[in-house]
Amino acid sequence: LLGTQTPTHGNIVVNNNDITALPAYKRSKWISMVFQNPAHGTAPELSILENFRLASLRARKKKLSIGINNDFRKTVEEKVASLGMGLEKKLEQPMGSLSGGQRQALTLLMGVMDKTDILLMDEPTAALDPKSSQVVMQLADKINKELGITIVLVTHSMKDALHYGNRLLMFHGGAILRDLNKTDKSALQLSNLQEWFS
């Protein structure tokens, strides 16, 4: 989906567009990414506000010299306040001084700042403590339900996959073992998973 690897065969179609034939800047209009490590995808030496501006400029292919106006600051304050972490009062604080959970939650917000269609999340809770993991997953669920953004989540947490996913693809050794929709998942028992991998 990101276009970093060429498919061995077939095409990847998003919004009736073959994205394998599109340049990266056009794919970036539809797809945003949240990395496993909260430090990736952000500039730790820049403030929270500057990181939001950088993410917005990248999404719009604008020059990085454009300043931060009051409207942009207000928009960021409102979005960050919705997290309930009090970070809207610390927008000048360097991103690198925040906890992993705080950075990952902010990275999620940055990924949807300019209304993407698809948000790719590569094990976004792998480096987080259980409480921060729950905050990040609940935020992702809210983004999906309230903004209608499709989330492709890569996770080793069957609990998260079963709880938050509408469709579940189970991989092993590079092959799809199971393709389940929400109805199929309701009958799925975690105790049955081991036999699928044997």
PLM region spans:
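Helix-to-loop junction immediately C-terminal to a conserved catalytic motif
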Residues: 2
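ABC ATPase C-loop
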Residues: 111-112
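Q-loop/switch helix immediately C-terminal to the Walker
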Residues: 46-58
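Conserved ABC transporter NBD signature motif
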Residues: 10-18
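Conserved beta-strand-loop-alpha-helix hinge in the C-terminal portion
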Residues: 175-198
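H-loop/switch region of ABC-family ATPase nucleotide-binding domains
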Residues: 155-156
